[in-house]
């Protein structure tokens, strides 16, 4: 059996973040919680999410692989109000996942399961020379700035600065987070630099994988030269990790 | 002659509710107020509205049939601000209806009359086994839930419950209003059940005829098995009635 | 050299107002401030803006002609937040204008200069029989009313009234600002009439040139019979002037 209860707001955040990059996923359920990971269709980005049983109000789970059409689940979850109680409940016999929203009215959706087998994908254990922690709002704004001039951007760590840089045929854009400057907002919350490095990424992917963040969420960004960027953040106890391959400049 | 004054907000609501289903209508005006009824172009739904003279600040009306392009009237009415005074005034000679908004500025529209003759349609006097009163907001949300899985829905009354149900090829949706459960919000304000019954309707029509309701409006819904559904509500003293034919399942 | 600092909000307003009608412009910079004027591509409207050095927090300017793609500049300026500090700074060597937004983060754009030579256009010195001052919000609403019935409108001054009038095949619209009526809001702030007159204009242009006004901005409108209309307004010390040729009715 599998049955879990939580608040709608948190589950919505986790599902939205995951579904921006992948279309279907296999929830690997067991007594400890829900895990899932998947690559985007073009195998450039990897998404991994972990919802330990502690984030649920009630949780009971045997071992199950629950294959889900994320697009359909996202639309259903979007129908829930933030303060409604959300109940997930596997109907093994009918091969369906029931999603129930409970307030003074009971609204129940049944969603057919997909034949998605568990991927056993793991986020590779890479050693990164640099990492920074940054508020998601400021990072997303820098991506929007870069979007005005080109469709790829360069993330640089150099001389006490984290720089988001983009250059088009005519114009260019640059956002500088300077670790040496007093920053009351703690926009750049952490800055750990091993060696100067830079990598270039597809902007659309970076936008997709940060689309569901809230402005105050802290993103932990791991960076090296011509290495995949790793971006981690937490949503009320659930953990999201994204890995994006660099664009190798010819 | 015909000349009537009211506040823009209320008239806007009545016109919007009516114009969601029909394109043209004949306002039957007399000393008691304005009445109109029309069928939608495919003859599946009937709309009827009644604005008694008491809802107007000033009202003077001889007997007139005023044929109106509802789409044009709706756009004009949309230009009025809620707290402006609205004056309707028939220019028999020029065959136009003048619509004037008055605040510190005077804005006057003249709209050409259509050759729509009075339909003398009446809402048929059907005996219904069941009726419920429900807040429009909750009903509209249930329609949106249903929309995720199919384009028609089933309204059921059974065992102290009013159920809105939809089933697609893969997924299904169900909203249950349970008369037996304490409901502080009075979402289900009344529940009068004669016999268990169910009918299926085109979802797009139900959405159209509830599109202009406010969340707190009370809809009175009359329901039987394979019978048209009748939905009534009031807007500041004006009465709106909708009748929608059931979808006969093959 | 040219370097100027101001708040983002004001500069955004001036650039938006200018860029609604023209695509490129030459900023004529000198020690007194920035001036620019341009005609729209179809030579029906003339736009002129003046930002004296007093509107800037800091200002230093030698004589320069700075040709700008207004569409690109508008998009960049749109990325600034209202309360950020904006720094304009000419890089003569690289032939670029740098636009920097400064808050706790520094965001810098470089925009390539265009080869737009100074136009030396002047707003012609026409004597107008009438002028009115009117709140932009009320004027824009009247344009929207007119838009429902036709794509051109007539501005009339007659008998203590300023009238915005439009007539379509079926319907018509008329907004009357009556100088004789007490108007607590001072919507019609001034009314100076020399002789009754009327001119007809393309509605889309009038909408474009008032698109960036705020509801409370005072527009000074100069009007005669079959003459261009001149519309002036101020944005925090900067001056905007628009001239629009009349539509000669055949």
Swiss-Prot record, chains A, B, C:
It comes from the Archaea. Belongs to the PCNA family. The gene is pcn. GO terms for molecular function: DNA binding; DNA polymerase processivity factor activity. SUPFAM superfamilies: DNA clamp. It comes from Methanococcus maripaludis (strain C6 / ATCC BAA-1332). This is DNA polymerase sliding clamp. InterPro entries: DNA_clamp_sf (IPR046938), Pr_cel_nuc_antig (IPR000730), Pr_cel_nuc_antig_C (IPR022649), Pr_cel_nuc_antig_CS (IPR022659), Pr_cel_nuc_antig_N (IPR022648). One of its GO terms (biological process) is leading strand elongation.
